[in-house]
Curated annotation (Swiss-Prot):
Mg(2+) binds at D152, N181. The lineage of its organism: Bacteria, Pseudomonadati, Pseudomonadota, Gammaproteobacteria, Alteromonadales. The keyword Ion transport does not apply. InterPro entries: Dxylulose-5-P_synthase, THDP-binding, Transketo_C/PFOR_II, Transketolase-like_Pyr-bd, Transketolase_BS, Transketolase_C, Transketolase_CS. Pathway: Metabolic intermediate biosynthesis; 1-deoxy-D-xylulose 5-phosphate biosynthesis; 1-deoxy-D-xylulose 5-phosphate from D-glyceraldehyde 3-phosphate and pyruvate: step 1/1. Disulfide bonds: none annotated. This is 1-deoxy-D-xylulose-5-phosphate synthase. Pfam families: DXP_synthase_N (PF13292), Transket_pyr (PF02779), Transketolase_C (PF02780). Keywords: Isoprene biosynthesis, Magnesium, Metal-binding, Thiamine biosynthesis, Thiamine pyrophosphate, Transferase. It comes from Shewanella pealeana (strain ATCC 700345 / ANG-SQ1).
Amino acid sequence: MSFDISQFPVLAQANTPDELRQLPQAVLPQLADELRGFLLKSVGKSSGHFASGLGTVELTVALHYVYNTPFDRLVWDVGHQAYPHKILTGRRERMHTIRQKGGVHPFPWREESEYDTFSVGHSGTSISAALAMAVAAEKEQAGRKVVAVIGDGAMTGGMVFEAMNHAGDLHNDMLVVLNDNEMSISENVGALNNHLAQLMSGRFYTTIRESSKKVLKGMPVIKEMAKRTEEHLKGMVVPGTLFEELGFNYIGPIDGHDVDALVETMRNMRNLSGPQVLHIMTKKGRGYEPAEKDPIGWHAVPKFDPSTFEKPAAKPSDPTFSEVFGKWLCDIAEKDEKVLGITPAMREGSGMVEFSQRFPKQYFDAAIAEQHAVTLGAGFACEGYKPVVAIYSTFLQRGYDQMIHDVALQRLPVLFAIDRGGIVGADGPTHQGAFDLSFMRIVPNMVIMAPSDENECRQMLYTGYCYNDGPTAVRYPRGSATGAKQVETMTAMPIGKGLIKRQGKKIAILNFGTLLASSLTAAEALDATVADMRFVKPLDVELVKQLAESHDMLVTVEENAIMGGAGSGILELLQTLKLPKPVLLIGLPDEFIKHGAPDEIISELGLDATGIQKQIEDFIA
């Protein structure tokens, strides 16, 4: 499916940055309007991240117009905002395939385009990568410019300030564009600031500034006074003190939707020496009224018709696991005011909106700072509170040392509610929850649970809440639950105990998590026994011993990496028990799982009922 590009006459002339740079500057505002219109149509047909890209249209046009990409390096942070970049870098005709199996990657991806200089998906990485590229450019005397684009949300992460502190010390030439789309840093936007930014980045100002440094070099007292005077004058109209203290020259804030102002300011800044910050103010969802009014709700969208100004109504479905968690958290908070909910900027995705509204004093959004979120939970546990850290599997990777050093080592009763465990689908390899069972299983003092349905999830969360001898983790997938009837009464499970769900012969399938229904279907065809193991750690030693002694072979099934996962734990236990037994491990292969619809990926990996049955039959053939 392709669009009639004649609707976008200027965009039709700019399929690559080289073509874009041939256009007269006078047509750039029209190009921005057409690019925004094309983005509306393409995402409406394909689904994807939406509001962020609408807010970076003018910025993207200006960056590729002023900088000689891909020779000059452009590094995007996270990548939600990079759809306009993809459209302008040769992928326009394939944008309708974004996030689909075999289609355009959802984030900037090195393997996909030479314009994607750094593969991204998690926040806070851009400045570190850009700094290294700037150092390399200086070592090679390449004359290459380097730009990092980062949002104000990502600026809350500690890695960002580590990188800026280092960049200020090294003093290599680089530009950091701070895309402020929440007005969380400054509201000083207007003609005065646009003019000031162009003036302060212009040749006259910078020449005077550098010449004064040389003249005052031998007069340190006067030099320090001049520096403080300059910072004071800039500080009266711009909020750049923090960046200046880190060693950056700060310009802005300016209107991020004025493409001419962006072009002129970037032209001035392109040849400035040392690290620079350009602070721009943008509106998430710009140009599409529903997204402007509700940028969070329109952050990522399914397929929709832009002309209706409405997202399609959600189809009736079973509650999601995130909603099951959110309801449980509210239910338990009603009874215990010492329950605290912590999230690293994932309130909506983790199902915590209602909790945050009903229990604001028990709710803590740690921002995009996973390390801090985990240790915050540890500190609360020290003071007798019951912290629940709600976090995506892929983002828990960023707080792993804190889980070990600050939580498990001290046996602190922190409950980790781990969302997006297993295959998440369209967001691809940066977001698949493939490794959590493996990296948690090796941590002493951890109790790890994997529910097979929403009722088990609710009971396991309560089990973790009741457990006081160390940290617990309940790991569940993205999306709708199984339709199991939820039992409102909460009962703590016996730690480390599984259940036989089907009695068969010869083959025993040990299932961990929500692939239980597929395991049961496969077992019907094979007349196999099925155990819902429930606990990844500690394992049910008695149950495993019983199954090993009464069956010819064991099969483990999990939606986690085979290497180091629950199946590996079964093998280790059998060795300890001195019970040699053929074991087939079914799970995720030793590779990064690409993007696509979850059902497609599950089927391709042989994790549906048909695939599980076939893998077992092939193993015993």
